[in-house]
A protein has these predicted regions:
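A glycosyltransferase accessory/donor-loop signature
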Residues: 126-270
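GT-A fold catalytic core of metal-dependent nucleotide-sugar glycosyltransferases
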Residues: 30, 34, 49-102, 125-126, ...
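Short internal beta-strands
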Residues: 1-4, 95-96
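Short, charged/polar "capping" segments at the starts of alpha-helices
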Residues: 4-11, 103
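Active-site-proximal specificity loops/subdomain of glycosyltransferases
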Residues: 8-58
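Conserved catalytic core of nucleotide-sugar-dependent glycosyltransferases
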Residues: 85-143, 156
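Conserved glycosyltransferase catalytic-site signature
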Residues: 50-54, 121, 152-157
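Short, surface-exposed amphipathic charged segments that create phosphate/polyanion-binding patches used
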Residues: 37-48, 107-112, 184-189
């Protein structure tokens, strides 16, 4: 689902998918479908296309009953059949709690009780039959038009409001976000042994902060992105950086190398 894509790039994707014995379909919604929305935050790196996430029930054919949505800053490292087979009876989506779920401001701004928590919309197993029956797309449009001042994190806020009573949470391994690898963030984890196992062996890895293609990314599993990139037609491509940026990167790393500053990320070998 995209506003547009060149025929050349469509063919590259068709060939890649066909090499694994599958096919791919492209959906290009009308330009005015998202006219009622606006980008509220991260406008320099997020386009209006993010709101397609709210409109899948209007975009996709009626015979599509379920969708696994994944952000583009994600690598799938293992079998997702367990996640795909999650029971979605009576709910709109299966999702994973956001690393920022404990920020009271979110619930005050969005006007729902924090006991329902807040999910990260980068990984969503969507029950499209439920969305059509409950007109989730229209609910998103109506909420944005009525309360635009409440929306900060774009479509993620909208979906959390509309689905706050109608979702099911699944384990972190299905959306292991950047913040869970960082020091200095209260993760409020009940079972640290289980949490550590999920950190070491995530199934869906989500680079929610610095992207692995950013030259200054410090993510401990950054290499996983390039491992899978090198299995595509874009094999060998790496971020380009000027001499100035490379020097800045070295200077940025020095305090961590000489342990003048505590590392940002956990050492997964500890």
């Amino acid at each position: 689902v995209a506003p547009s894509l060149s025929e050349e790039n469509q063919q590259i994707l068709r060939n890649l998918v066909a090499s694994y014995g599958n096919d791919i379909r492209f959906y290009f919604p009308p330009e005015d479908l998202l006219s009622c929305f606006a980008i509220k935050k991260f406008g320099k790196r997020i386009s209006m296309a993010t709101y397609y996430r709210c409109m899948f029930s209007a975009i996709l054919p009626d015979d599509v009953e379920k969708v696994l949505y994944l952000d583009c800053d994600i690598v799938v490292l293992g079998d997702i059949s367990e996640f795909w087979n999650t029971d979605l009876s009576g709910c709109g989506a299966a999702c994973i709690e956001d690393i920022g779920k404990d920020e009271d401001e979110r619930y005050e701004r969005l006007h729902y009780d924090r006991s329902y928590s807040y999910f990260n919309a980068g990984v969503l197993l969507i029950n499209l039959d439920y969305w059509r029956e409950h007109k989730v797309d229209k609910q998103c449009v109506e909420y944005f038009q009525t309360y635009p001042e409440r929306i900060l994190f774009n479509d993620q806020d909208l979906l959390n409001v509309v689905l706050h009573k109608d979702k099911v949470f699944v384990p972190l391994k299905w959306n292991m976000q950047d913040g869970f690898y960082r020091y200095g963030i209260d993760k409020k984890v009940a079972d640290w042994n289980s949490f550590r196992e999920e950190l070491l062996h995530p199934v869906i890895l989500h680079y929610t902060n610095k992207k692995p293609w950013n030259y200054d990314s410090m993510h401990p599993l950054r290499s996983e992105y390039y491992k899978y990139l090198d299995m595509t037609p874009w094999q060998g491509q790496r971020p380009l950086s000027s001499l100035k940026k490379r020097v800045q990167w070295c200077m940025k790393r020095l305090p961590y190398v000489f342990r003048f500053r505590k590392p940002k990320y956990m050492d997964l070998g500890e």
